[in-house]
Amino acid sequence: MSINEEDYLQLEKEIKLDDIDFSDLEEKYEVNIGLDNYIIVDGAPIAPEAKVPVLIKVLRKLFSQVGEIVEGDEGIYMPLENGKSKGYLFIQFKSTESADLAIKKLHGKKLDQNHRLLVNKLSDMEKYGVDGAVNEEFIEPEIEPFQSHGYLKSWLQDEQGRDQMVLHFSETVGVYWNKKSADPEPVIEPRKGFTSKYAKFSPKGTYLFSIHPQGIQSWGGANFNSIKRFFHQQVRLVDFSPNEKFMVTLSPIPISLPDSTVDRAQFPFGPESEGHKLVIWNMITGEPVRTFALPPHLEGQKEMPWPLVKWSYDDKYCARQGPDALAIYETESNFQLLDKKLVKVDGIQDFEWAPAGVKLHNSKAVDGKHVLSYWTPESTNQTARVALMQIPSREILRTVNLFQVSDCKMHWQSNGKLLCVKVDRHTKSGKTIFSNLEFFKTNERDIPVEKLELKDVVVNFAWEPNTERFITISRLDDGNPNPAIPKNTISFYAPEVTKGGVNHNSKKKGGAAIAAAVAAAAINNQSSTKYKAYTKIENKHSNTIFWSPKGRYVVVATISRTSGELEFFDVSFDDETNKKSLPANVKLLKTDKFSGMTNISWDPSGRFVAAWSTSWLHAIENGYRLYEFTGNLLRDDSIDQFKDFVWRPRPPSLLTNSDKKKVRSNLREYSAQFEEADAMEADAAVKEIILARRKALEEWRKYRAKHISKQGNSKNEVQAEIIEEIKEEIIEEKEEIVE
């Protein structure tokens, strides 16, 4: 039956299409017009039409690594113009996820030396490429107002010259003033949840850092206000450059770029950092300046050697050790490799920068040269070697060949004049270990090396700051490792100069004269210097050495799970009964037992020593003790769940040598002032008496000045003034009981 047009139109009017459900058909025949699985790649090479198929093949192989590309010409389209490609192309992936991954992984990828690929979604190009989508009128960016954090070195202005310390107990962290035997005075209110792991000061004490799952937070100023945030998820280890310009962080979790474009814009890392775990930060801007992947041999290690990045004394260079090579970077050239290549050192085991500029013989450099030391083990056709290298020239200044070497440890003296290499050697049978000490004298011609051969194994070595004296702890390798038997020997070494150095028959006595003689020997660069153990203490459990930062005083301690002991020594003791003047005159000042002790630290002034037991290792006598440099116990504070004690470092003194000389000449006057201040702080009654006397004296001076001005300048009167000063001193006190 046929229907004419008129009837069809009438029927169409009668049928209500809105009542019919077409959803199944719409879903079945839906046309996908979305562009989310398309990307546009810019920065590709401009190639002749004949070479375009080869270029497409290369790019297809590259982008297929992140996802499946549609086959044929629909998968990759590269426009041509005048017989050449136009430098960009379109790629269609089979899924949106593959397109997102391509942008995340390959944006910024260097195809070769001259071409870097820029990858974006086609939908973004369409979004921003349409006329009017982007405002062409320049809008001045809003600059955030400067936010002052106060004076970052405000603690140095303390009138009493006190040092600050961090006490970490339970979940609370507090910063306190050291008040000797009295309760520490809080600088700010202690904060609960201040850090999720530990708190740490920068090397000069300017910043305090807290560790969090999201990264690191820096604090500073008088009230420890928030300064910068450094985003690095699950960071574990932190280190700093000596001058506080840079910070290094390490996380076990590799860096992963966010999927969201908005989040990626706020993310501090770019595609080149994908998968990296080690980050160097600029501490001023808070931005990452370089990231690194961990070397393959360190991946999966439970105990990570730290630091992985080591710095020159002035922050100008930093270096990383890799397999058979050193990577040295110039911080002033955006952390580019020195000369754009690695320093090849086959088998390198360890390296250390000189902690100060090395003034090489006949060098006119005021600040000294950058020098690092490294060692390599024995191989089939080569001996073990220790070498000194100058940077940036890479010149090898000195090399020493060593035989039958088990291990080496390099110890630079604080001013860079000496390097001691502790060489653990084995006998031909390999059953016995003993140590040699190799001393490199960097200031002398050709850098001579003095050798000190020992029969014992040196388990610890430490230089006295700024001198040639040092201490070793050693033991005889007799095959009996029983820790209950005290077998360690503490040896105090000093230079024995045989020609024009230390004068052993000097008429000047005392520690000051001895220290001056030792310093003179170092300055005179006597190549005939030998090192002699002036004092040995045998049969000890001692295993650690802690020199005062000012020298002369040292704590030799036993730190173990079962026992703890501190021994305080003066290595320049003024002994008037001893007529001999020696480079080292050692006196045991005090001994104290501290079971459960885990750590020891000197304050920056060298006046106080803190020892503590941390709950991070065990629950035995958690808390801390505070000692004077002579070993007198000032404070014993047991604190449940005590975790850490951190002194706040101080920057180097700004005083010139003439200023320091002036202070030393007026030391008695300053000592009297300090003793008065100590007496006031220790006893409230004494404080009231002293303040009352000061007030009375000030009133008398005002009264006297007032009446002298009234008398005028009379020539006929003889103006005489008698001032009586009475000093009371208690010589001796005795208490007698009268029955």
Swiss-Prot record:
Residues 1-224 are annotated as: Sufficient for interaction with PIC8. Pfam families: eIF2A, RRM_1. WD repeats lie at residues 190-229, 231-293, 301-339, 343-385, 453-502, 537-579, 592-630. One of its GO terms (molecular function) is identical protein binding. One of its GO terms (biological process) is translational initiation. Residues 1-98 are annotated as: Sufficient for interaction with HCR1 and TIF32. Keywords: Cytoplasm, Initiation factor, Protein biosynthesis, Repeat, RNA-binding, WD repeat. Residues 37-124 form the RRM domain. CDD domains: RRM_eIF3B. InterPro entries: EIF3B, eIF3B_RRM, Nucleotide-bd_a/b_plait_sf, RBD_domain_sf, RRM_dom, TIF_beta_prop-like, WD40/YVTN_repeat-like_dom_sf. Component of the eukaryotic translation initiation factor 3 (eIF-3) complex. PANTHER family: EUKARYOTIC TRANSLATION INITIATION FACTOR 3 EIF3 -RELATED, EUKARYOTIC TRANSLATION INITIATION FACTOR 3 SUBUNIT B. Belongs to the eIF-3 subunit B family. RNA-binding component of the eukaryotic translation initiation factor 3 (eIF-3) complex, which is involved in protein synthesis of a specialized repertoire of mRNAs and, together with other initiation factors, stimulates binding of mRNA and methionyl-tRNAi to the 40S ribosome. The eIF-3 complex specifically targets and initiates translation of a subset of mRNAs involved in cell proliferation. This is Eukaryotic translation initiation factor 3 subunit B.
